[in-house]
A protein has these predicted regions:
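Conserved acyl-donor/pantetheine-binding loop and adjacent beta-alpha core of acyl/acetyltransferases
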Residues: 58-99
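Conserved acetyl-CoA-binding loop-helix of GNAT-fold acetyltransferases
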Residues: 89, 93-117, 138
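Conserved catalytic-core motifs of GNAT/GCN5-like acyltransferases
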Residues: 70, 127-129, 144-162, 195-205
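Conserved beta-hairpin
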Residues: 45-70, 192-198, 211
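Conserved beta-strand-loop-alpha-helix junction that forms the acyl-donor binding cleft
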Residues: 97, 124-139, 179-181
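C-terminal "cap" of GNAT-fold acetyltransferases
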Residues: 156-178, 205-214
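Conserved GNAT acetyl-CoA-binding A-motif
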Residues: 88-90, 115-134
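Short amphipathic alpha-helix that is part of the acyltransferase structural core
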Residues: 1-53, 59, 174-177
Length: 214
């Protein structure tokens, strides 16, 4: 699991990318998908993409910071679900990274820190496709370990999105329920005022602790 194998942090050199990094972005996204969608060139112009070459000549990871007032698919989906309806803030797009890239948690934490420099934490969101596979569960765990709180599951085209918030006070009292990522009850529990900041593992995979928000 990534949480257990995150080691080679001495090769962590994340930085904001510039237009000259576009060819490297194209190479990474050819296999992983474009972090910011069709507006990647514009995002590079505005220093809105965090990237890491990890001490190599090849871009190993990238993540875009999209404006909530924009027309990206992520921003539209979140606003339609009632998140950031005023158009303020940032939504962090799903990261693109190579299979060999290890410091995922550190990369996510740095992206969160950069977003907080640009706007208040209660205006920062992150979205990630709900993927009930071992890799998808590991990435969800990385988000939670990086300081994000799972707030909702919303539709986007034919898939579902996990919506994380950068600042959500979660009650530390009794757990409402422990569920797996693929449990159909998860969206309903979150809709009823639950949030997830803690997690664990069992034989079936990732276990999310749903608690009431304070």
């Amino acid at each position: 699991m990534l949480l257990m194998t995150e080691t080679n942090l001495d090769v962590f050199h994340a930085q904001l990318l510039v237009p000259q990094d576009a060819p490297a972005m194209d190479q990474l996204c050819a296999a992983c998908g474009t972090p910011g969608g069709p507006d990647t060139a514009a995002l590079l112009q505005t220093n809105a993409v965090l990237g890491d070459y990890a001490g190599t000549d090849t871009l190993q990871a990238a993540m875009a910071m999209l404006p909530m007032f924009g027309q990206s698919r992520l921003a539209l989906a979140l606003r339609a679900a009632g998140f950031g309806a005023d158009g303020q803030g940032i939504v962090l797009a799903p990261p693109a990274f190579t299979a060999q890239y290890l410091p995922v948690r550190r990369f996510l934490a740095m992206a969160l820190g950069l977003a907080k420099q640009r706007c208040a934490s209660y205006h920062i969101w992150a979205a990630l496709p709900l993927t009930p596979t071992p890799d998808g569960e590991e990435l969800c765990a990385q988000y939670l370990a990086s300081g994000f709180t799972l707030r909702a599951v919303v539709p986007l085209d034919s898939q579902q999105l996990l919506v994380f918030a950068a600042h959500t006070p979660v009650g530390r009292g009794s757990t409402v329920r422990r569920v797996h990522l693929q449990d159909p009850a998860l969206p309903r529990l979150l809709e009823r005022g639950g949030a997830v900041a803690d997690f664990g593992w069992d034989k079936q995979g990732l276990v999310l602790s749903v608690r009431r928000m304070e």
